[in-house]
Amino acid sequence: MKIVKYWDDFFDWVKGAELVELNEVNTKDDPVRPELDNKFRTAHGRKIFGLMDKKEDIEGVACVAFTNEIPSTVKELELMSKEADLVSAHRAGQVGSTAVADTLWSLKRGAGKKLMRELQKEIKKMPNIKQLVTLSPLTPMATHYHIRNGAKLIKINTTTQNFEYEIR
């Protein structure tokens, strides 16, 4: 059937997509926290991950901080990741016990789900990380995305919400 063939072609790029670490992103593309510059996103052990397709195009982005607690604001995220980074100097570079995805966005249909699955796999390789959580805005879109992708809502804050993903 033509529809099945079109559908397979439409999502074919997902099969070869892989998670890569990035040095920077166009922060204006970030629909969640465009005010955070690349310096913030990569300081104190924070990382930017991109979902790269076969053509080496970035189709989705996740910014992750490593902390020892679950933040409820960006300021807490900043302070907690700084603290975890300082402590890591005494633990052979193992930063924090909690990975916090503070912003995620996709540039292509299907990239968000694939990005989160690949991020879960990447986090599993980090022996010091015990949980993967988000610092998400209080929006129906964020709630729907995380619940649809298997996360559990663990806390609602004044301006954000935290979801927890199983580390697979």
Residue spans for each PLM region:
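Short amphipathic alpha-helix that is part of the acyltransferase structural core
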Residues: 1-44, 48-52, 57-58
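Short, well-ordered beta-strand micro-motif
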Residues: 50-52, 63, 164-168
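A structural microfeature
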Residues: 58-60, 155
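Conserved acyl-donor/pantetheine-binding loop and adjacent beta-alpha core of acyl/acetyltransferases
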Residues: 63-103
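Conserved GNAT acetyl-CoA-binding A-motif
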Residues: 99, 124-138
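Conserved beta-strand-loop-alpha-helix junction that forms the acyl-donor binding cleft
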Residues: 105-106, 133-144, 157-162
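Conserved acetyl-CoA-binding loop-helix of GNAT-fold acetyltransferases
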Residues: 106-124
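Conserved acetyl-CoA-binding loop of GNAT-fold acetyltransferases
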Residues: 147-157
